Amino acid sequence: MTTPLAEVLDGQHAAELRKAARALLKQPLLLARGRYAEEFRLARRHASELREWFDRNTGWALQADTEAARLRKSPGVLTDPTHPARDTTRGAAPFTRRRYVLLCLALAALERGEAQIALGRLADQIVLDAADPRLAATGIEFALERRDERLDLAAVVRLLLDLGVLRRVAGEEEAYVSGAGDVLYDVERRVLAGLLASRRGPSTVHAEAFDDRLAELVAETAMDSDELRFRAMRRSLTRRLLDDPVLYYDDLSDAELGYLTRQRGFLTARITELTGLVAEVRAEGIAMVDPEDDLTDLRMPEQGTYGHVTLLLAEHLAAADGPVDLDELALRVRELASQHGGFWSKSAREPGMETELVAQAVARLAALGLVSRTPYAVVVRPALARYAVGETVIREPGSAPVPPQRKATS
């Protein structure tokens, strides 16, 4: 029996819409050229429908023109430090505070600059701006004379290249780092203009404390009616369901938990319809799981030495009945090295490496919502139970642990 043309077209439309939505969630800045060109075309084709969905359900604005599609995402939890920018060319090292400051100074310099700029010229402008007494008072200084400072700037430039803000015309960053040459870039001004994802310009924020400034940047309109308060909760919860590996009930306020209890089916169904993510509801919380295992920047388990160590420590932590000291985990890694070291890299077996291995593992587990950290210990969260060795104890019907997946975001 032949399928009616209308059904075929509806199915094609739904598939394109889902692919575009997933692409925007994974890469919120899509360019007309490059590896996401196909996804950009779909996002632009369905921009009106996507714009309405994201605005209603998350409060994220979508802008699309002939050069780029930009989903202005903001995180559901502003204080989450587990998703830093990374220098993918150097072991995925997370950005430090210094690199973030350099990034902001570089963006400011590019905004004022011409259509082309050399890396050396960009560095000179950053040094001048960094001399501002207000910045110096924070303890951040840049002379860009030392190799480590130039490496930091090169990492920032590589991020801007990856985002499409810059296009390399000639030269290599390594030549600049070593002092043997310079690099020339085209500045994509429309892409640059779309990077800022705040609801208001930072220059209009007058609060002094960091937390207050951050809150002002993303603040919505005054919640002076039940309708507006419910809308704010719907948007906040949907953002967290889309971005966070697990939404734990005990992280919510009483009002948020009450709203989620009443609207859970509606919220999760809307997300599933658009993205294909599937809700797994358990006693402790909800995880929107991706059957395609694509909408995530962190996986568990992962390949390689660090992935193996992380999995082994997850099994160890799942059996804990309270906080576990970091020193205890380091001791456990030394024990594991004697059993499994033959499968690890040579550097991981060197004396003293257990501290770094623990730090890497705990960072990944925290980013996946499996543990939380204190300065000297690790606290297990319910979803880690899926990595326990042996039978999982079910506390009540439906309380099996939820599988974690950290959604990609930027």
PLM regions and their residue ranges:
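Internal, well-ordered domain-core segments that constitute the primary functional module
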Residues: 106-186
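Hydrophobic multi-pass inner-membrane translocation pores used for secretion
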Residues: 225-410
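Basic, short loop/linker segments at the boundary and entry of helix-turn-helix/winged-helix-like folds
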Residues: 76-102, 294-306
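Short amphipathic alpha-helical interaction segments
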Residues: 42-53, 144-162, 350-364
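A short, conserved structural fragment
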Residues: 58-62, 155-157, 161-172, 276-280, ...
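Short acidic, hydrophobic short linear motifs in intrinsically disordered regions
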Residues: 24-39, 113-141, 247, 322-349
